[in-house]
């Protein structure tokens, strides 16, 4: 799965619909269906919830990551959050719900238990150490999520800094998945600067294989998360 951001002509984060469509076209031309393309709906201090929702509803992408706290806003309301997420699921958009701490996870579980967010093939992302000193992650940051995760949703982690690979190993050992790469970290596990994004991905691959975790194909991902 490729996690995709785009930027405008000034290098700023963008949710431009046509920009995303062009980026998806270029990637598809290169890899065909052998990769799942997950776009971001991230606010990045630029967009508000209505604009984020409008962009994703217009795009109807193959997959998207959505920060729960970014869309769970008073001007959207619980009903609006439910309509948005449930609508994506009905259209077989693979939705990864980003949770920054255990409070986000508890809020997600509350929305699920009360039926605001309906049953679907949701995928959770636990963000480790987002608000730690120096934004450096530790495997210990996973424990509050594991202690509170009561649902059946599969989950992944992302982490910051040189301990990224250790966090990935911890997640893999507990049955989780991982988002890895330059978005959150530039360092290899030995503390050296990674020469490219591939180096970080390969670290994660070798770690998973050492723990007996097989690598998913694009077809595997689409089947597990209800893709089209």
Which stretches of residues belong to each language-model region?
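Catalytic alpha/beta core domains of metabolic enzymes, predominantly
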Residues: 63-183, 193-195, 199
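Active-site beta->alpha loop and helix N-cap motifs at the rims of alpha/beta catalytic domains
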Residues: 11-77
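Mid-to-C-terminal alpha-helical segments outside catalytic/metal-binding sites
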Residues: 202, 206-228
